């Protein structure tokens, strides 16, 4: 990431006018500033509200209490926390090019940023494992993917990113070898997350490329198996066996639709975050010369992934739309609302 311009003109505005070593503020036209605030505030509000609907729906409606939905609930919680803890402060930093919240909170913010991003992709990775058993081994799915197993998934999805993020940032291992650059750009009001060559590669591999590759491999296998199942189930007489196959076909269709939806969620995640992680790897090798605005564009493209997930649920999950209607109309406050049917039961 580019260092702040150290050659100041007389018209330069500073983050802290009274400070001797203040960072310069980036001058932007008022119209551009207003547009940026509108877009980013809109994204933050949509992320908060959309993921809140997912959280309330799965937590409240008993019909949605399933292992897969518990994973989705936890992922929505991750996205909701991102919109509350990370995005508002990143918005001010991106637009004003200043950090007004102190050095300690800069570290905490950076930790939360890394942690929640990594937690999201870990959730998606475990959701792909869940879908693999649901489609490829449906007869044993209920006994293999239990609430206890999902609990282990959630423990790993949260604990590993927390240890990774806070351990890396507070140990400053990511700064070893980049001390001269850090000293050159140091000023009051600066909060940037810098990775040296080693940790730029390692962090991106751990948080994105490794679990992303696992997910892609799992979903390719799922789609291959789903196509084979579809070809095997064909028309036949209405015997007990045919009825059983019909039931299997209905179940397979339901699982296939759910898998396609979750694949879209994963695909959107990869498309949103891939540019940022490529930049994280390449920036140390090109002398940290990535333009600040390009860095912010890629960063916010990644944040928008947390905005898109509830929209995808709304497009593909009827239960989400019905739950949203019940929340908006206040029907959810009825005493028997938790037992409401949000989607038809399969025979």
Swiss-Prot record:
GO terms for biological process: behavioral fear response; chemosensory behavior; G protein-coupled receptor signaling pathway. The chain crosses the membrane at residues 38-58, 70-90, 111-129, 150-170, 198-218, 261-281, 297-317. Residues 59-69, 130-149, 219-260, 318-347 are cytoplasmic. Disulfide bonds join 23-187, 106-191. It comes from the Eukaryota. It is found in: Cell membrane. GO terms for molecular function: 2-phenylethylamine receptor activity; G protein-coupled amine receptor activity; trace-amine receptor activity. Keywords: Behavior, Cell membrane, Disulfide bond, G-protein coupled receptor, Glycoprotein, Membrane, Receptor, Transducer, Transmembrane, Transmembrane helix. Pfam families: 7tm_1. Residues 1-37, 91-110, 171-197, 282-296 are extracellular. Its main location: membrane. PROSITE patterns: G_PROTEIN_RECEP_F1_1, G_PROTEIN_RECEP_F1_2. SMART domains: 7TM_GPCR_Srsx. This is Trace amine-associated receptor 4.
